């Protein structure tokens, strides 16, 4: 069977634009999409699972529509990151009220387990723009400064973000899990 891309979005404007360029997009969420069982090789949640009301049920639905041995990919803000600890309430990825849930390595592993997946791999990374966005919030609201980041700080932040990501403390959590065969 040739590769098939199917998308689901709860944003009507995004759905309309995607459909206008020929993409196969359904409006709604995974729980209401009605995909057939054992159909997909991969289900990808890219910064979306933290927005759903029932992440366990959503992942259970992903498991249902995956073929045996199929994989689920999660890309999530990492509440256990050095960024979250450093910036506290000013970490940009808390993003209330849009983010209904926050995950770290342990809670994402538990979530995947509750949904019936077997964890394969978890890593982290940090983007310089996310890190500097948090720094901007901190300086503006806590330090009461409109300080802009110079090129030296941007380069230092870039190197720091790479190191934090490789050490497992990055601001983005990347988890891969498999539906048992």
Regions found by a protein language model. Give the residues of each.
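Conserved SAM-binding loop
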Residues: 1-90, 102-114, 172-180
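Bulky hydrophobic/aromatic packing residues
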Residues: 23, 80, 91-94, 154, ...
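A broad, structure-centric signal for solvent-exposed, well-ordered loop/edge residues
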Residues: 37, 93, 129-132
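Generic, low-specificity signal for short hydrophobic/alpha-helical stretches with a mild N-terminal bias
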Residues: 44, 85, 90-94, 145, ...
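Generic alpha-helical propensity signal that fires on short helical segments
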Residues: 90-94, 104, 112, 135-140, ...
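A short acidic, glycine-rich active-site loop
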Residues: 95-99
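A SAM-dependent methyltransferase catalytic signature shared across enzymes that methylate proteins
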Residues: 105-124, 152-153
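A C-terminal cap/extension of S-adenosyl-L-methionine-dependent methyltransferases
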Residues: 124-181
